[in-house]
Amino acid sequence: MDCKVVSLNEKDQFIPKIKSSDPVITGLFQYDAAQQTSFEKRMSKENNGREAALANVIREYMSDLKLSNEQELNIQHLANGSKVVIGGQQAGLFGGPLYTFHKIFSIITLSKELTDTHKQQVVPVFWIAGEDHDFDEVNHTFVYNENHGSLHKVKYHTMEMPETTVSRYYPDKAELKQTLKTMFIHMKETVHTQGLLEICDRIIDQYDSWTDMFKALLHETFKAYGVLFIDAQFEPLRKMEAPMFKKILKKHQLLDDAFRATQQRTQNQGLNAMIQTDTNVHLFLHDENMRQLVSYDGKHFKLNKTDKTYIKEEIINIAENQPELFSNNVVTRPLMEEWLFNTVAFVGGPSEIKYWAELKDVFELFDVEMPIVMPRLRITYLNDRIEKLLSKYNIPLEKVLVDGVEGERSKFIREQASHQFIEKVEGMIEQQRRLNKDLLDEVAGNQNNINLVNKNNEIHIQQYDYLLKRYLLNIERENDISMKQFREIQETLHPMGGLQERIWNPLQILNDFGTDVFKPSTYPPLSYTFDHIIIKP
């Protein structure tokens, strides 16, 4: 597999500004992610003393998996005080978007580079956001159908949308297998298809909860790298979090004030507010089989779906004795994660790192230092066919990744058309505009006639526009094969107006290039970069 790095002219300059150590952006974080001294400082930080307990919890969480030697070693390293690089993601259907895998590769790559540079073992940890309850965000994925040259949405259907956390959700296995079958119907059959289908079927048969199936697929893919997994909703982990839940409840108003102040500061720097929340407690409580947002009305802590209320002593007692009923929101999850782990760096997507920029004062309030916040690696897969099509139409890859192919497609259509025809129609439009101006001069001062002339002009312009559009549409139809090829480039490299990794599913890559495509023996070694990586399988 070949690998190259390209620099894109990105519309969103947040990550390029991190790369260039822009003082406005780096000032939002504790550390400058582009400076080696930041890593030296984090690597030398004292540990928090929770590493041995965390190692036991992670071992228990992964006990239903057959651990690799690399994972066994990393659990031992963690227990002995090794620091971590961490990142997480929601448990998406069949692995979710490709960027989930790329986030894990980011964690692996940075962990290895830090281990090699500092001669200290750094452990890669992936945090599964099983506490989330927005099932609509994880119950679907997309698959590219080569025969149709288009993407198709594949969704796991439920009679009722679950309101509990995804870790507490147990999908119907027959329905899930039908969803899997639908996905494979759209994918082309390759020599890898049957083996991949068997792996997925086995995971569905062997595991019951939504997040356990997600974990098993990730484990199957990344165990050889030594990645450790933990679910935010895992009960033994929640028990470790009890002291922090109590602190959050006691300081909830100060926490909310700190968050709002930091968010306002980011807006003053010209950034849009990323975190949208009405709560002033920033925790959820599981009650009546629903994940319910907690807020404080000045006297009571109140749940948003059942209107159940608690006085402070009651809710703190729940945090102490039943911490598994609590879960974090977007504000407190990063805080809890860093309180638990001895983290060198947190790896996040473009939106995630903007969330973290709104939390600096929250970390300081709880005397927890924000780690280095690193943008994850961004990766696109370029197969031989798409590369040949780019060459055929002389389209720069970097341009497609940023803008898509619509501009190049329109240019191609006009090149196939009669230039004289287009020029004459456009000339008639310009002539009509001049005529309209002359006629308006003739009827100046008479509003009825002005309206009549303008309406007549509008009709003529519409007719010429229609003539030109229909003519170009006919050219499109005459070049149907080329139009399909442009669509193929678009759906592969810039699907739904964004990067491939945000839409495509990992199963598509596994099916096309083999079930070992992401394994160390096949996948190219990566170097950490803020630029874009192109991989040719």
UniProtKB/Swiss-Prot annotation:
Function: Involved in bacillithiol (BSH) biosynthesis. May catalyze the last step of the pathway, the addition of cysteine to glucosamine malate (GlcN-Mal) to generate BSH.
One Pfam family cited in the UniProt record for this chain: Rossmann-like_BshC
Broadest EC class assigned to this enzyme: ligase
EC code(s) of this entry: 6.-.-.-
Family per record: Belongs to the BshC family.
Gene source species: Staphylococcus aureus (strain JH9)
Taxonomy of the source species: Bacteria, Bacillati, Bacillota, Bacilli, Bacillales
Residue ranges that the Swiss-Prot or TrEMBL entry lists as coiled coil: 422-450
Alphabetized GO MF terms: ligase activity
Matching NCBIfam families: thiol_BshC
Protein name: Putative cysteine ligase BshC
Assigned keywords, A-Z: Coiled coil, Ligase
